[in-house]
Amino acid sequence: MPNVETNLTKPFPVVFSGHTLKYEIECICKIFLPIRKFTFLYDTAQLPEDAEEGAVLTLEQQGSQSRFFVRVQYLGKTLEQEQFFPACSPETDKQLCEYRFSAMLFRLLEQITDLHPAWGLLTGIRPVKKVQPYLGKGYTKAEVCEKLHEKFWISPEKLSLVYDTAIVQQPLLEKTPKRGISLYLSIPFCPTRCSYCSFVSHSIEQAHKLIPGYLEKLCEELVIWGQLVREQELLVDTVYFGGGTPTSLTAEQLEQVLTAVQDNFDLSHLREYCVEAGRPDTITPEKLKTLKRFGVDRISVNPQTMQDSVLETIGRKHTTAQTVEAFRMARAAGFDNINMDLIAGLPGDTPEGFHDTLEKILALDPDSITVHALTLKRAANLFAEGESQVHNPVEQMVQESMRRLPEHGYAPYYMYRQKNTIDNQENVGYARAGKESLYNILIMDESQSIFGAGCGASTKLVEPCGRITRIHNYKLSLIHI
């Protein structure tokens, strides 16, 4: 992908005339200008006089018609497009107006930059939801892909990926109990902070004094959730320990939290109990035995890469040898559902290095492999280095995983997209049949309530009508305590 960025520090102005349809327009701009900041102007129909680049989007009502006009100045080029449609209003026809502006802006930016995003116009984080309405209506794969391509201009490879993912999910979602809920526990501590990470987490070195008090409050929160689950006669379907790195706790501390879960919830209907062991250097036989004793049946051992030089660059204080040791330790402890996370596009990594990582992971034969595309979030140290990271060969790495993993019996079972993902790529979980993570599927499908406990956890309440209410806990451990 060519370098299309100019002055990265100067905001890119976007002018809205006759409407205020900002959200989707900004999303389209970010596809082509992923780390630029934007200035949004509403009280003018023109770019500022000193602007060397920017976009103008105008909506005018002309009798029985609406005039849509888009002009883009970028990379020394100026392109514009004008279209007329039957009269529509941004107040009463918001989605339609957004779609028309998005399509026009997308085509102009595509022509100027010579970039052809594989996901086309699709900006949402849950592509599988675009497929699901067709599955119950008897549409074939070819028919579904044709319809989505016509509307969103998605590439054949991505269409096949999202369709195959939806097909794997369908029977698992059909088995979800009507009164089922998932329980998420946040353990926001890590041995060290990775340079790419923007999650609210604290290194053990800095925050070890906070842990006892934090766990005490977490267990108190579990008592409250447990009471609510009993009163409402709900069924705990899945439990997921995330973070952070849950195994940065000691075995005794893990037992404290696991006991609180066991004492406050009926786990007899549980379909999945997952703990993100995460960092290989935090995994010990004692911790694995503790997890196994409390019924945990799925864990993650997350190397992110099997290149020692890259691990050092991103601030992960473990080696590939420790990853192999931790994985074998988990197998010896009796875990038969182990996931391994990889990240495509890490600083210092190359297509050759990623290929070598894939080969080493496949040799270990985990039960599932999740491939993330590096996301430049504003809270991460890497964001400041965004200019050099925006156009690295992430797409090539992701495509290799899409090809190699199915060859070894792994099928895509869940996926999601994020803003500021390098090369506009996606995160995909691949699994052997029967080893899919139910929690991962459910959180993306948004069809089941999730009760979040701990710092930074989010609760998602899904009503029978489909309406979703989100409740966010405090992000910082000190505030939570």
Task: Indicate residue ranges for each PLM-predicted region.
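Short Lys/Arg-enriched alpha/beta "domain-start" segment
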Residues: 10-50
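Short, well-ordered secondary-structure micro-motifs within conserved domains or adaptor modules
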Residues: 36-80, 85-90
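Canonical Radical SAM [4Fe-4S] cluster-binding loop centered on the CxxxCxxC motif
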Residues: 179-215
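Conserved non-cysteine loop/helix-boundary elements of the Radical SAM core domain that shape
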Residues: 201-401
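Flexible glycine/acidic-rich beta-alpha junction loops that bind and position SAM and/or redox cofactors
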Residues: 309, 313-314, 344-351, 366-391, ...
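Conserved small/polar residues in nucleotide/adenosyl-binding loops
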Residues: 479-481
